[in-house]
């Protein structure tokens, strides 16, 4: 019995030694060799983020109206673009990017207006530039701005008026 027990121990030792030897050889083969060549992979990501402007204003106003008229604009983008750290912009066509309400046939009849903005938006240069921007987040992807026309001050004549606004997005 003693010899059988010793043989088992010897076989176990031989087996363990062989496994140990093989595993050291396998690990040696898995070591990273020195650098012999280098290649750089390049990826260009383009700004394909959509941006939309939604506006609302009263459809009709009488000449005799003295009630202030509010024009609202909302700029939004997608959630993925917000995750990427996008910044949405809104600006008008007037001097210093102000909003211009202009009569479509009587071009002398126009008013340059300073927009009001929501609390999380900013003017590009407060007091001198009416371009508005907002760093959007997944929770808040909307820039809101508005202008008020006071018919007591900005007298409106019959006809159609227009206001052109632009929106953009960058990072």
UniProtKB/Swiss-Prot annotation:
Keyword Signal: yes
Keyword rRNA processing assigned: no
GO-annotated biological processes: adhesion of symbiont to host cell surface via host glycoprotein
Keywords carried by this UniProt record: Fimbrium, Plasmid, Signal
Compartments, as annotated in UniProt: Fimbrium
Family matches, as Gene3D superfamilies: 2.60.40.2910
GO cellular component, one term: pilus
Signal peptide coordinates: 1-28
Protein name per the record: AAF/I fimbrial subunit
